[in-house]
Amino acid sequence: MGISPILEAAYGVDGEANDRCEAGRSGHISGRRPLSLTRLQPTPRMTPVPGKRIDIRVSQPGAAGSDHEPTFPPYDGPALFSFGFRPFFLGAALFAGIAVPAWILIFAGTVGSNFLYAPREWHVHEMLFGFLPAIMTGFVLTAMPNWSGRTPLRGVPLATLWGLWLAGRLVVAMPGIGPVAAVVDASFLVALAAIVWREIAMASLWSRMPIGLLISLYAVANMVFHVLALRGAATDVAERVAISLILILLTLIGGRVTPAFTGEYLREHNIPSPPAVFSRLDRLSILFVVVAVLAWIAQPEARVVGVLFVVAGVTNIVRFSRWRGWTAWREPLVFILTVGYGWMALSLLALGGAVLGVLPAANAVHVLTSGAVGAMTLAIMTRASLGHTGRPRHADLMTVVIYGLVNVGALFRAFAPASGAPAGMANVLLAVAAIAWSGAYLLFAFAYGPILVRPSLED
């Protein structure tokens, strides 16, 4: 099978479709056409049919699919709550811009803290189970109408879900409310999983079950984190499960959109030698990641786990080198995907090095969470925000600065503290990393916030 059911769910395309085809333009919120995450992919168009796969066959670049698309009831509420990517991308960006500098101030002892959990647990929880789920939710809620053919979550239901996410951020920052805070926070991912499973059931999209399973596992990991933290126990296993799910998602989704958009760019600019199509090497690289993370969850200190991570890293480096992503450097909106996937492959090597005792574990984890997650999420957030609001898919100067900041922050956070600098200098380097990384998200909120709160240019 050329593509996993997870990606079929996210993009609504058959796994055997030509790997270089890109699912087409989707509609906007006025009721004329549906808005979907596949707006990220400019051509060809496709027709969502509830309960059925959309089988796209492309015989040559530029071939077009169907122009017939389902019509949704008109929406006349606030633009911010017209589609899931709007409130959740904006909320995640603002939260990252606040939470990361707050953590550095606490870590350096500049300010005190009085959170539900110890400062380190608060930071880990809010990045893994607060910030990332917001972006995940924006992604999924925008993709669902495409693969279900049903009206998207919008208006009051969407605002309620966003409010539940926000409530989770508030209660976890409060002391003394223990189980109540845990229930409030955990209910968000449970609600998201329920929404996804409802769409799967209502449209009989059983082939899309893996995406519901992954979100459900993420929700369970969050609940396990709360149970362990409330008991004063180590939360390592919940953290490893969450990080493992992130690695799998980045390998699958990044491994699909990166060559697709790179290939589109190369075709548009008549550059020969397109990215390699999905092959046995891609399957093996995904398999090695899955095997490595499963072993890591079970036996985090076993040397064989370190070897598995290194093998997974090497195969994924070979994998993404075949996509020729460097040839798209003139369009940062495309090139940032290659950078993000490169961070992901590097994080596998770093995790292997950590298990083998070569690198500090915190540095290895931040290669993934600061580098791969930072670059890939902002790549998706910027491209989706432009495409779904009727704007050209081109990175302006502000967007290039956003990409630069997040990568500079990731470099400082992932490697500088391991450079042997004195403690005082290490704190300075961490502060620089936090300012750059969180600054990228604040700049996204500043530059893209007006886009996200206003109607599409096509309305």
Per-region residue spans from a language model:
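Hydrophobic alpha-helical transmembrane segments of multi-pass integral membrane proteins
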Residues: 6, 37-459
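Compositionally biased low-complexity segments, especially N-terminal hydrophobic helices
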Residues: 7, 29-36
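Acidic/polar hotspots within intrinsically disordered regions
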Residues: 11-14, 18
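Small-residue-biased low-complexity repeat regions
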Residues: 15, 24-27, 31
